Design a protein with these regions (language model features):
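Anion-recognition interface
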Residues: 1-273
Length: 273
């Protein structure tokens, strides 16, 4: 949050000083920093360069690793996340009309500052890889050259671990309607708590077993066309192959968004309606 300017300059200096002290004292030869929003920092803030310089002063060489989803899936996840923090009143179709044109989903452009700062040391892992059935974590460890050291420490439970579960269609639509009613302005504390209540309520009743899938075929087609050239450049640079040869799409499934009308209760929950 310091690097992306959500904290003031003094806190930014303090955070970087703490990181520098850790790097100076650690006996480790590998340090991992993980933050999803690293991928969308404004170039003006020079986050890759700041980190590369800081690490270099302590004898570390920056590498960039990223997990890649098709833009349509990433946009659905972004929409569900906004619902999870009760910050979205638009339908998915309306969300796509503005967000679907955002340059933050141009992966080739977003990666370029990190590629330069890391002197080309980039590991790009497809969320689903046509070339491998191995779990994502195993592929990430191998891709970073840490397989021999870490693979013996990773059991089946580690490889299958999931966190930050995405909201499903019931919680997403409930959040959207509550936002439009202004309920988010009446919450004490972070409104993410309200989103978690919606998720927990749905999951406890056997609802939302699947993550949200928006109903906007025309918008998703425009998204695919808009980013096709950038994806081709990205795939050629990272894998030396075409995008479709590496990236496996999500299994085909119909939209489950409920914005078009009231949700029909699931059989298990019908008695509670």
């Amino acid at each position: 949050q310091a690097l992306d300017r959500r904290r003031g300059a003094a806190e930014r200096r303090e955070a970087l000083a703490r990181l520098d002290a850790i790097l100076a004292a650690t006996p480790a030869d590998t340090v991992l920093l993980s933050y999803e929003d690293f991928s969308v920092q404004r170039p003006l803030w020079r986050v890759p360069e700041i980190l590369a310089d800081l690490f270099a002063r302590r004898g570390f060489a920056l590498e960039a690793a990223l997990v890649v989803k098709p833009q349509a899936e990433q946009l659905a996840s972004a929409y569900a996340l906004r619902a999870q923090v009760v910050a979205e009143g638009r339908t998915f179709r309306g969300f796509l009309r503005s967000e679907g044109a955002s340059r933050r989903y141009d992966y080739a452009e977003r990666l370029e500052p990190w590629r330069r700062a890391a002197a080309g040391r980039v590991t790009a892992l497809p969320y689903r890889d046509r070339r491998s059935d191995a779990p994502l974590l195993a592929r990430l460890v191998d891709g970073l050259g840490l397989g021999e050291r870490l693979a013996p420490l990773l059991g089946p439970a580690d490889l299958a671990y999931r966190t930050n579960r995405s909201s499903g269609p019931v919680a997403v639509e409930a959040s959207r309607r509550l936002y439009r009613l202004g309920v988010h302005r009446q919450v004490t504390g972070h409104r993410r708590l309200l989103g978690h209540i919606l998720d927990d309520w749905a999951w406890a009743r056997g609802l939302d077993a699947e993550r949200f899938r928006g109903d906007a075929p025309e918008g998703l087609a425009r998204v695919a066309a808009r980013y096709a050239a950038g994806n081709a450049r990205f795939a050629a640079a990272c894998w030396g192959q075409s995008w479709d040869a590496v990236i496996a799409p999500a299994p085909a499934a119909p939209p489950n968004a409920l914005a078009a009308g009231p949700a029909a209760p699931a059989p298990a929950a019908a008695g509670e309606a």
